[in-house]
Amino acid sequence: MNIGQRYGWEFTLAALLIIEILLFGIANSRMLDINILLLSTSDFICIGIVALPLTMVIVSGGIDISFGSTIGLCAISLGVMNQAGIPMAAAIPLTLLVGAICGVINAALILYTGINPLVITLGTLYLFGGSALLLSGISGATGYEGIGGFPQALTDFANLTLFGLPMPLMLFLLCVLICWLFMHRTHSGRNIFLIGQSSKVARYAAIPIARTLYLLYTLTGIASAIAAIVLVSYFGSARSDLGASFLMPAITAVVLGGANIYGGSGSIIGTALAILLIGYLQQGLQMAGVPNQVSSALAGALLIIAVVGRSISLHHHQIRDWIQRWRNQRLSS
């Protein structure tokens, strides 16, 4: 298989991204300013940080819709620890631990109950979200303001640049590299595809399904914690609703990036490109004065188009054969 066939969808997404930026640039020249393009990634790149491990979960045949609540819980946990006087050097690792525990809870419930991951993570979505609200109430934080008073070293992080790139974007690129190497260049990563294609065959092949799923859901929890820390740095406060709007864009990015929603196939690079495509779509629409409700509706339409388009691309041979048979029947009649 040559590069064009193997990465055809990724090349398509890259081309669409360039076309999108050029079209929005015609409407508003600010979209062609490289500095604005780079700095504006901080508005949506945290979604990408979570979408990367979510890609691996979906490729394995699972799903996790609780990550938005996990982000809120991790953010509030960081705020409460800061209020308690715990230094950031300890609070940040503890926040990552909170995210990891959320992932372990998801994996344990899925494995030991055998219930559909969608149902389990729907339950933990409310569990983690309720816990975040409880902690927020105990801390005395208001819903709008959240918990503030973070050290300047933390709040400055999201505004720093490295080699001309915003730190959140650099962190995202690092996550892309790590997830790509793990998923596409390690034995454990190849196991993810096998589990997603057929868990029964994977079990007969002695693939450690439980260990792999624990790892994937834990990584999603840790990524949620990382996103929470970056969001707290970006907004300067910790709120329980910080990840509330992440669900649809993240899943849309994973599916648009080439992942089969039923498992067995997917692409880290595809997800990364899809995040930029969706993020710049919303940025461009906002610059054009389009209301947020319309951009959300377009994101939903994009998800449907992605699912239908991906399905057509995967089954184009069958569709072509069906059209040929239909034509032959018409000619014979």
Swiss-Prot record:
Topology versus the membrane: Multi-pass membrane protein
Intracellular or extracellular location(s): Cell inner membrane
Domain of life assignment: Bacteria
Chief location bin: membrane
GO molecular function: transmembrane transporter activity
Residue ranges of the TM segments: 7-27, 45-65, 70-90, 91-111, 118-138, 162-182, 212-232, 240-260, 261-281, 288-308
UniProt GO cellular component terms: plasma membrane
Keywords: Cell inner membrane, Cell membrane, Membrane, Transmembrane, Transmembrane helix, Transport
Family: Belongs to the binding-protein-dependent transport system permease family. AraH/RbsC subfamily.
Subunit structure: The complex is composed of two ATP-binding proteins (LsrA), two transmembrane proteins (LsrC and LsrD) and a solute-binding protein (LsrB).
Function: Part of the ABC transporter complex LsrABCD involved in autoinducer 2 (AI-2) import. Probably responsible for the translocation of the substrate across the membrane.
Name by which UniProt lists this protein: Autoinducer 2 import system permease protein LsrD
